Regions:
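Conserved SGNH/GDSL esterase-like catalytic core that processes O-acyl groups on lipids
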Residues: 33-41, 45-127, 150-152, 159-160
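Catalytic His-Asp segment of secreted/periplasmic serine-dependent ester chemistry enzymes
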Residues: 149-233, 238-240
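Conserved beta-strand segments of the P-loop GTPase G domain that flank and frequently precede/overlap
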Residues: 109-111, 142-145
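Extracellular/periplasmic envelope-modification machinery, especially enzymes
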Residues: 20-21, 28-31, 59, 63-82, ...
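N-terminal secretory targeting modules
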Residues: 1-41, 45-52, 64-66, 100-105, ...
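Active-site flanking residues adjacent to catalytic metal/cofactor-binding acidic residues
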Residues: 41-43, 144, 178
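Catalytic-core regions built around general acid/base machinery
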Residues: 128-136
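A short helix->loop->beta-strand "cap" motif at the edges of active sites that frequently abuts
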Residues: 137-141
Length: 241
């Protein structure tokens, strides 16, 4: 009788031990946070903000010690979508990242200036903005609006694009718009001689803006992950009880 009881006790303890080990393994596996990637997708203004002699923004972003990976991708003449002088527009560039398994946790979009050529077409702007936002999906996005003063046409076109951007962003809860147009209008000396690109002081200001936006985006990304992970761990560790 005693031997049978001891055998049952040993079997019960073995089952409990296995359950505890399994629970701890699952809990720890789920507790590992995924790597977070920030992508800044822009044109020549972003290139200048990242150039070592101007804004040098990449090391400043890394110094935040927030996102595990920071990608600053700025290319001359890049537009949002459609034909471009540069090799890849914004949509194609983002699709390329997805194809190579780069999955950004948050995105700063700084495009639109090179989509103003031709004529002022509200539907044209809207279609391209929506195309990129749809591709990006539901991760946090900040879009920096545009400002060009290199001709009367661009002075008129920039606010139209920005108005369309503001309206479209309302349809995407994960998207916010930053008003670069107002910032640089208050600091016209940031513009270079061509009234399109920037002086070094302007690129430094743009880099500072990117750093601020990156910190804000991190504060959005982290609570989502932390809340989910905490809930999962609590649920897992309460199973044995």
């Amino acid at each position: 009788m005693g031997n049978a009881l001891n055998l049952r006790v040993r079997r019960t303890l073995t089952i409990v031990a296995v359950a505890l080990i399994s629970c701890i393994f699952v809990g720890n596996a789920r507790a590992v946070e995924p790597a977070h990637t920030l992508l800044i997708l822009g044109d020549s203004i972003t290139w200048g903000a990242n150039y070592k002699g101007f804004g040098n923004v990449t090391p400043k972003l890394q110094a935040l010690n927030t996102f595990d990976t920071v990608i600053v991708d700025g290319a001359f003449s890049r537009n949002i979508s459609g034909p471009a002088k540069t090799l890849e527009n914004g949509v194609k560039t983002y699709a390329k990242y997805l194809k190579t398994k780069v999955r950004p946790s948050a995105v700063i979009v700084a495009l639109g200036s090179n989509d103003l050529q031709g004529s002022i077409k509200v539907r044209y702007y809207e279609d391209r903005i929506r195309e990129l936002l749809t591709l990006i999906g539901d991760i946090p996005v900040v879009w920096v609006n545009v400002s060009r003063i290199d001709s009367q046409y661009y002075i008129r076109a920039s606010p139209v694009f920005n108005k369309v951007l503001n309206r479209v962003a309302l349809d995407y809860p994960n998207v916010s718009v930053v008003d670069w147009h107002t910032m640089i209008s208050a600091n016209p000396k940031w513009f270079a001689f061509d009234k399109l690109h920037l002086q070094p002081v302007g690129y430094r200001a743009r880099a500072t803006l990117y750093v601020e936006l990156a910190q804000n985006l991190w504060n959005v990304v982290v609570p989502i992950t932390t809340t989910t992970t905490t809930t999962t761990i609590v649920a897992a560790t309460t199973i044995p009880g």
